[in-house]
Amino acid sequence: MGTKWTEEQELAINTRKCNLLVAAAAGSGKTAVLVERIIKMITEGENPVDIDKLLVVTFTNAAASEMRERIGDAISKALEKDPSSEVLQRQLALLNRASITTMHSFCLEVIKNNFHLIDLDPGFRIGDQTECELIKQDILADLFEDMYAKDDECFKDLVEAYGGSKSDDNLNSIILKFYNFIMSGPWPESWLKDKVEEFNINSIEELEGKKWIEVLKESIILDLNNAYSMLTQARDIAEMGGGLEPYLVNIYPEIIQVEELRIALSEGIVKFYNKLMGASFGRLKSVRKASVDDEKALEKTKSLRDESKKIIENLRDNVFETSLEEAVLGMKKMYPLMKCLSGLIIEFSNRYRDKKREKDILDFNDLEHLCLEILIDKDEEGNIKPSQVALEFKDKFEEVLVDEYQDSNTIQETIVGMVSRRDVENPNVFMVGDVKQSIYKFRQANPELFLEKYINYREFEDSNRKIMLYKNFRSREEIINGVNYIFKTLMSNTVGELEYDEKEALNLGASYGELNEENVEKEYIDEIENLKVAGDIELNILNKAGNKDYSDDELGEEEEDLDSIQLEARIIGKKINELMNPEDGSHYMVFDKDLGKYRKIKYKDIVILLRATKNWADTFVDELGTYGIPVYADTGTGYFQTIEIRTILALLHIIDNPMQDIYILSSLRSPIFSFTSEEFADLRLLNKDKYFFEIIKEVVDGIYDESISKDLKGKCKYFLDYLNKWREKAAYMPIDEFIWFLYSDTSYYGYVGTMPNGVQRQANLRILFQRAKQYESTSFKGLFNFINFINKLKKSSGDMGSAKILGENENVVRIMSIHKSKGLEFPVVILGGTGKQFNKMDLREDILLHETLGIGTNCIDVKKRIKYDTLQKHAIKKKCELEVLSEEMRILYVAFTRAKEKLIITGAVSDLEKSCENWCKASASSEDNRINPGNVLKGKSYLDWIGMALTKHKDGDAIRNVGNGDITLNLDDKSNWSFKSFDRSELLETNNNKKEKNNIDIFESNNWIESKKDIKEVIEIRNRLGFKYKYIESCNTPSNISVTELKRAHQEEEFMQESYNIIDNESSEENKKEKIKRKPRFMEERQEEFSAAKKGTITHFVMQHIDLDKVTYIDEIREEVLKMVKKELLTEEEGKVVNVFKIQKFFKSELGQRMLSSYKSGKKVYRELPFITEIPSSIIEKNLDPKIYGEEKVRLQGIIDAFFEEEDGYVLLDYKTDYVKEGEEEAFINKYKIQINLYKDTLNKILGEEVKEAYLYSFYLEKELKISKE
C-alpha cells in the first residue's frame, strides 16, 4: 500500500509550472514530499523528465546522499513491479549523473567545466581550511609591515583606534571579520565601498531615508509602545480609585507626552529628536500607604509609571547621547578611517586571491564567487545579466529544487536566480523549508529571503505560489499542544521574525495507537495497568539560592564548590532513572515504528539537548555516570586534551626542537620513556640553568657519572638514541608516514589500546594520522609547519572533536547541541541548560556589520582619546540584537520539535522567587494571551521565556503563587504542564547517599590484594601506594600567592590557635551546651542581588576610574558613575549599587582632602597599582627547615588601592567596604595589618624610600584608621 498523502502534500507534489514555496512545519514530511515530487516528475506523465535535467540543492552532503539513496530505492521498487519499464531503467542509469548536490558541490562542478572562462589552472584543488588560515595570517603580516613602512598617518590612526592596547592583533581580527562577512554576499567589494560612503554625510537632512534610520525608528516605536502600554495600565489602576487618584495628575500628561512622541517620530527623526529633548517626567505625587485600599495596586501603579519613565530616559540619555548635529559630525569624522579600513580589506582580499592562484588552491568562498563570475555578464550600462553558461543552465534544468531554503544566503540566492527561470517565462524554482527553523545566522543564512516570498507568494494558482504543510507526523498531541502554546505566546514578528498564529501552528498528523494488549510487547501484556506513556511536559527548575531549612555551615567544602551545571545534571540523572525504573514499579513505554508496538523505554530513546555543549557536556557525562547511566556526548571538543594526542604532539615538538622543557618533560614522563618525578628532580639539580635536553646530553657524555645512578644514565641514553633516530627520519619522511612510524616504533598505538576506553584512544590517534595526510596535500611541508598547522587548527577551529566510534544502535543516552539535533527526532527529549543566558558578546564589539544596514562603529577621536557609539551603531546594534534573539527563539522551537513522545525541560535560576516575580510582571503587563514583544526582549534565557509564557497557563499556579502575579489566564489551551523546583540541599543529599553506597561497595571489595599469589606484585603495588615524597613539607607552599590569600592564611592560623585556647579553658559543662548556629542571611532578609564582596569590587573600580576633578558634589560623582555605565565599564545594575554619598564622604575626609591636594598641586597620585614581588617561603610556611628551604622564594602579587606623594614622603591608602562595629576598630586594623605592611614593604622597594604613613579607610565607618609602624 502506498503512502497516504494529505491534500496539502499532494499539492506540493503535483503543482507545476510556477515558482513554488513550500512552508513545511517541523515533522511535516518535507523530505518525503520532495522525493515523491522528483519521482513523479521523472516517471509519470506523457513526457517524464530525465533526472539529470533537475538540479536538487541540499544543505549538507549527508542530505544529498540520503536524497540520492531514497530516489534510487524508489526507482528500484518501481522496477520490481514493472521490470520492463524503459523509463525507470533510464532514470536509474542517469541517477549517478544527477545534480543532487550541495551548493558548494554544484559551484565546483560549474568551475571545473568552465575554468577557461575565468583564467583558472585546471589543476586547482580545494585548500584545507587551516592551510587557508595560515596563508591569511602570512598575508596580513606582510600587509601590515608594508603599511608601517609607508608611515601613513591615516593607517596609524586606524591602528590607534582599533589595534588594541598592546598590539595590532585586534585590527587583524577586524579585517578578517570584514573579509569573511562581505564574502557571503555576491558583490563584496562594491558592498564595502557603498557602505563606507554612508559615513560621508554633511547634514542632518541626509539622515532621513537611510535604511538604518528606519530601523532605529522601528526600535524607538517599540519602546514608545511599551511606555504607552505601561502608562495606560497605570492609569486604569489609578482610575479605579482606592486612594490612587493623585497619581493621575502625573500619568495623564505623560500619556499625552508619549503619544506626541509617537506622532513626532512618524514625521521624521529630526522632529522626534527635538520633541524627545523637551520630554520630562515630574516628581510623582506623594501617596501614603496608609491612605490606600490596596497596597499592591499602589506598588504596581508606581512600578509601571517608573518603568515607562526609564524607557524615555534611556532613549534620551543613551540612544541620543549626542545631538543630531554631533551624530552627523561623528560619522563624518569616521569617514577617513572607514575608507582606510576598506582599502586595507580590499588590498588583503587581492593579495589573498593572488596567493591562492599562485598555489593553485581555492577556498569555499571562491567556489560561490567564481561560479557567479562564470554565470554573469554585464551589458553596456554595467547592469548584470545571465552569461551564456547561465542561459544554457536555464534551458537545461526543467526544475531547480532547493531544500532547507530558509538557510540560504544572498550569494546562493543569486546563483539560483542565474541558473533557473525564476524571473522569466515558465518559472521553475521549487523551494521547501521552515523559516521557524532558520538557525544558521552565524553562517550568514538570511531568513529574510524566505520571509519575503512567504509574504508575497499566494496560496492559489499563480506564477509565484506557496503551499503550507502544517501537519506534524512526528509528535504526540501532548507535545504539539505544548509547542503551540509556548510559541503562540512568545513568537512574533519582532522576536522570531514571524507571527506564530493558527496558520503557523502545528496540527496533529501522527497516529500513536492506544496502549492495549494488541500493540504492546508480549512480556508486558499482563501488566497493561502498570504501563505509562507520554504524560505532561515537565519543567524542572534548580533554585541556586538554596533551601531555607539549611544553613551554609551545614555544607561541606565540596558542596560549596558545586556549580549549577553539576546540580542540573543530577536533576536530569534523577529524571532518567525515574523513566527507566519508576519507583512505583511501573514501566515507561515508547512506540516503536519498526515493531508497530509499544516497548519499554531504552537509554538510546533519550537525548539531552543543550544550546552549547562546551563546559556542559563533560560535566553531564561525569554526573550521569555516577547514576549508572550510559551516556555519550557528541561535543566536537576535547580532542587535543586527550592524553594520547597530547603525548604524541609533545613528541613531535621535541623532535622538531628539543630545547622545549615542557614538551620534553611531558615526553619523558609518558609510558614511552617512564621517567619518574624524582629522576626529573635529580636531573634538574645537576644544573639549574640549562635546558633538560642539554643536561641529558651531558649525562650521556659521562659528565655527571658520580652524581647520578646507572639506571638514570641508561634511561637518558635510551631517550637520546631514539630522539636522534626520529629527528633523522623526520627530515625526509612525509609527516603522515612519520607519525605512523612513531606509533609503531614506540608501540604507543598498541599501548593506548590496552588503556580504559582504548578503542576510542586508538581512533583518536588515527584521526591525527589522517589530519597529517591532509596536511601533506597542502602547500606547506615539514614538521615545523605541521606543528604550526596544528596550533592554528586549535585556535581557529577550537577543536576537532574525538573520533566517533559509536554506532546508531548503541544503547546510550546521547548529549548533543540543538544545532546538531536539527532534522533528527527522539522519543524522549530532555532540554537542559535553559537558564543559561543568551550570548550577546558579539554586540559589544567595536564594529558591527549588517548586510542591509552596513557598518556600525564607535566614533573614535584618537587625539582626544574619547570614544562613543554613533547613531548608526545604535541602530545596527539594536537590529543585530533583535536578530540574535529571533534566532534564539527559532533554536528553542527546533529543540521543542525534536520530541516525539516526552519533553522534559530543566534550567537553573539564581533566585526562584525573584525570577517568578519577573515572569509574572512581564505577563501582567502584556495584553491578551501573548507576552508583549517588549517583555520578551527583556528575557535573558530560554527559561525566562518559558517562565513568562507559563504564567498565563492554567497549570502555572506554582509560578504565580511564588511570583504573586495577578494575571489573565489562557484557559482554552489544551497543553498540560507539571512543575518541580529543586533546592541545592536536596540534590547534595542525593549525592551524599550515592557516595555512601559507593564507599560501602569499595570497602567490601578491598581485600583483593590479599588473594594475589604473586607477592612481588603485591609489594610493588603497596610501595607505590605508600610512596612518600622526600620534600613533602614544602608541597603546601604555593609558587604564587596573593596578598589576600596570605592575609587569610594568617587569620586562619590565629583563629585556630584561639580556638585551641578556648577549648583548653572551657569546662566540660560548657562543652555540653548546644551550639548556636548562625541564622543564614536568606532567613533574616532576602538576599541582595550583589554580595558584599561584589559591592566592594564595584566601589574599588569606581575609586580607580573616577575623575578627581569631579568629586566635590554628589551630582558630579553620580554623573561619573553614569558615564562608566554608558561606556559599559559598569552594568546598569552595578551602577545602581554604588553609594555616591559614601564616596563623597571619603573625599571630604581629611585623608581624601590630602589626596586631592596632592593631585591638584601636580604631585603623583597612583590608584590600583598591580605589583609582583618575592618573599621568603618561611613567611607562608613557618615550619620549613631554613637549612633546606632558606633560599626558596614565593612570588607575591597584589594590587595597592592608592598612594600619593606629599612634600615629605608618600602616603599609602587601602579602601575597605567591610561591615565594622563601632568600637572594634582595633580588631579591624589587626585583621588587615599584615596586608598593609606587605604593601608598605613593596612600595619601599619600588620607590626606593620609606612610605611615611599607611591608612585603612572604612567606607562603612566613614573614617580613616592609621596603621602604626611595627
UniProtKB/Swiss-Prot annotation:
Domain UvrD-like helicase ATP-binding as annotated: residue spans: 3-476
EC number: 3.1.-.-, 5.6.2.4
Gene Ontology molecular function: 3'-5' DNA helicase activity; 3'-5' exonuclease activity; ATP binding; ATP hydrolysis activity; double-stranded DNA binding
Catalytic activity: Couples ATP hydrolysis with the unwinding of duplex DNA by translocating in the 3'-5' direction; ATP + H2O = ADP + phosphate + H(+)
Cellular component aspect of the GO annotation: cytosol; DNA helicase complex
UniProt xrefs under SUPFAM superfamilies: P-loop containing nucleoside triphosphate hydrolases (SSF52540), Restriction endonuclease-like (SSF52980)
GO BP terms, alphabetized: double-strand break repair via homologous recombination
InterPro entries: AddA (IPR014152), DNA_helicase_UvrD-like_C (IPR014017), DNA_helicase_UvrD/REP (IPR000212), P-loop_NTPase (IPR027417), PDDEXK-like_dom_sf (IPR011604), PDDEXK_AddAB-type (IPR038726), Restrct_endonuc-II-like (IPR011335), UvrD-like_ATP-bd (IPR014016)
Pfam family, one: UvrD_C
Domain UvrD-like helicase C-terminal: 528-823
Record key words, sorted: ATP-binding, DNA damage, DNA repair, DNA-binding, Exonuclease, Helicase, Hydrolase, Isomerase, Nuclease, Nucleotide-binding
PANTHER family per record: ATP-DEPENDENT HELICASE_NUCLEASE SUBUNIT A, UVRD / RECB / PCRA DNA HELICASE FAMILY MEMBER
Quaternary data: Heterodimer of AddA and AddB/RexB.
Role, per record: The heterodimer acts as both an ATP-dependent DNA helicase and an ATP-dependent, dual-direction single-stranded exonuclease. Recognizes the chi site generating a DNA molecule suitable for the initiation of homologous recombination. The AddA nuclease domain is required for chi fragment generation; this subunit has the helicase and 3' -> 5' nuclease activities.
Similarity annotation: Belongs to the helicase family. AddA subfamily.
Stated name of the protein: ATP-dependent helicase/nuclease subunit A
Organism this protein belongs to: Clostridium perfringens (strain SM101 / Type A)
